[in-house]
From Swiss-Prot:
InterPro entries named in the record: C4bp_oligo, Compl-Cell_Adhes-Reg, Sushi/SCR/CCP_sf, Sushi_SCR_CCP_dom
Signal sequence, renumbered to the chain: 1-28
UniProt source species: Cavia porcellus
Name of the protein this chain belongs to: Zona pellucida sperm-binding protein 3 receptor
Location relative to the cell: Cytoplasmic vesicle, Secretory vesicle, Acrosome lumen
Segments traversing the membrane: none
PROSITE patterns linked to this entry: SUSHI (PS50923)
Tissues in which the UniProt entry reports expression: Testis. Not expressed in heart, brain, liver or kidney.
Keyword vocabulary terms for this entry: Cytoplasmic vesicle, Disulfide bond, Fertilization, Glycoprotein, Repeat, Signal, Sushi
Domain Sushi: 29-88, 89-150, 151-215, 216-275, 276-342, 343-408, 409-467
Glycosylation: residue positions: N68, N77, N185, N191, N200, N433, N455
GO cellular component: acrosomal lumen; acrosomal matrix
Protein role: Probably involved in the formation of the dense core and M1 domain of the acrosome. May also regulate the release of certain secretory proteins following the acrosomal reaction.
Length: 533
């Protein structure tokens, strides 16, 4: 019934047949064979139902070649399965296009397209595209490479009262340039040179119309109070330029640059010089001009309405309710604000102090201002917070060093070895109480609480932190445990010395103190005996 099954190998056919027999009652059959873009069934069938295991053979379409087994098989799931078995054939490389380029859009495989284009100034003769198509048993390009030929322009036009650089024998191709010149006493109006360009990618045209040659004469303008910075003759021709300024105290109204036009007139209109504005920067006390104003420092005239901003110098501040600006008024005078005033520093609290150079005839908004200084002394029992009792008012409105003031006598931080203070700082004020806490293994010898007295000393006397000998360490005869009793493992040297001494003591004890009496005095014996017991 299915002669196409003969194309399947015998072992594969046996496996497919067995699976079909076993699974056919359980699973569904396959529908019509699949429609593949690259191949068609060898035998066309209009059946719509195929048993599991059916294998159909396909042939590759034109433009494709077989790379694998070309069978599709109905599997146990009722689906047609296959591996891609046809691949697109490849067209040859199209080569290089002189004065143009070949653009490969995707690849060189069957069905792909390449595009041709010419370089600027060249016209394309032939097809702009070519496709990789089937030609018999192989594939090749549908269209050959086109030709790119250079674009040509007609001869440039002649002009009256002038000529161009070309000759009758010249061939004008893309990029060719010709230049026009006028006869003596004539001015060239327009572009002196024109070039051969391409229109619509195929037609050669000149870049613009040729210029003309005309007689143009402009006379030097009369500008009262004006100064000519360039151009000092009496007559000028087309495109000649004048640069104009005004004398000090006058301002230019109009353009400072004018050109002689083709109609023998100046353009823009001839300017004028008028006395309009404030002269020079005004004098304002204690200010510094902003950077953009400093750039105008050499400017002689400022127009009416000119607004100049300033900052206050170091140590000065803007006068309250006054703008930090000066304005040029219609009467050609500067409207000047009150400027800046010195920065104030706060008046010191006179409690427990007196100022040696106290000011009594001050004027202004504050008692002490920038650059003022104070010498002061403190009452008995107090001292200045600045070492020399001197303080100066700074630009930021702060006293340096610190605002003049007096503090009560202080005590320095007590030095407690192997201990710490309840309050840690460098200085302590009068009547301030401090508690001493010894490190672990140490005990306070002396009062634990001390107070800063008015004479800058601590009372009672500053205590010490000494090693507290544990009960089990008081008997040193068994010196082996002595290291465990030490407060600090770094004291190994001391421990070894003590251990050595304990061994000697033990030996002396065994010898019934015979040799001890020879080596030690009665007082030393008493100390050793006490240490052993």
């Amino acid at each position: 019934m299915f002669p196409r099954l003969q194309a399947v190998s015998a072992p594969a056919l046996l496996q497919i047949t067995l699976m079909a027999v076993l699974l056919a009652p359980v699973l569904g059959d396959c529908g019509p064979p699949p429609i593949l873009p690259f191949a068609s069934p060898v035998i066309q069938s209009y059946e719509t139902n195929f048993r599991t295991g059916t294998a159909l053979k396909y042939n590759c379409h034109r433009g494709y070649w077989r790379v694998n087994s070309s069978h599709v098989i109905c599997d146990i799931n009722g689906s047609w399965i296959y591996n891609v078995f046809c691949a697109k054939k490849r067209c040859r490389n199209p080569g290089e296009l002189a004065n143009g380029k070949v653009e490969i859009i995707t690849d060189l495989l069957f069905g792909s397209t390449i595009e041709f284009s010419c370089s600027k100034g060249y016209s394309l003769i032939g097809s702009t595209t070519s496709q990789c198509e089937s030609q018999g048993k192989t594939v090749d390009w549908s269209d050959p490479l086109p030709e790119c030929v250079i674009v040509k322009c007609d001869s440039p036009p002649d002009i009256s009262n002038g000529k161009h650089s070309g000759t009758d024998e010249d061939l004008y191709t893309y990029g060719s340039l010709v230049t026009y010149v006028c006869d003596p006493n004539y001015s060239l109006l327009g572009n002196a040179s024109i070039s051969c360009l391409v229109a619509n990618k195929t037609v050669g045209v000149w870049s613009s119309n040729p210029p003309t040659c005309e007689k143009v004469i402009c006379r030097q303008p009369h500008i009262p109070k004006g100064i000519f910075l360039s151009g000092f003759g009496f007559y000028y021709t087309y495109k000649d330029t004048l640069v104009i300024s005004c004398k000090k105290g006058y301002i230019l109204r109009g353009s400072s640059i004018i050109h002689c036009e083709a109609n023998s007139k100046w353009y823009p209109s001839i300017p004028t010089c008028e006395p309009n504005g404030c002269i020079d920067l005004p004098e304002v006390p204690y200010i510094s001009w902003e950077r953009n104003v400093l750039s105008l420092k050499n400017q002689e005239i400022f127009e009416i309405g000119s607004l100049l901003k300033y900052d206050c110098k170091t140590g000065y501040r803007p006068t309250p309710n006054e703008p930090r600006t000066v304005t040029c008024q219609e009467n050609l005078k500067w409207a000047i604000s009150k400027g800046c005033e010195r920065v104030c520093c706060p008046t010191p609290n006179m409690e427990k102090m007196r100022i040696i150079n106290e000011r009594r005839d001050f004027t202004g908004v504050c008692v002490y201002a920038y650059e003022d200084y104070i010498f002061y002394m403190c009452d008995e029992g107090y001292y200045p917070i600045s070492a020399d009792g001197r303080s100066s008012c700074q630009a930021d409105g702060m006293w340096n060093p610190k605002m003049p003031a007096c503090e009560s006598a202080v005590c320095l931080k007590p030095d407690i070895l192997n201990g710490k203070l309840s309050v840690e700082k460098d200085h302590y004020t009068e009547t301030e109480n401090v508690t001493i806490h010894c490190d672990s293994g140490y005990e306070v010898v002396g009062p634990q609480n001390i107070i800063c007295s008015e004479n800058r000393t601590w009372t009672p006397e500053i205590p010490k932190c000494e090693w507290e000998v544990p009960e089990e360490c008081k008997q040193v005869a068994a010196g082996r445990k002595l290291l465990e009793c030490l407060p600090n493992p770094s004291d190994v040297k001391m421990a070894l010395e003590v251990y050595k001494l304990s061994l000697e003591i033990e030996q002396l004890e065994k010898e019934k103190y015979v040799k001890i009496q020879e080596k030690f005095s009665k007082k030393e014996m008493k100390q050793l005996t006490s240490a052993l017991h």
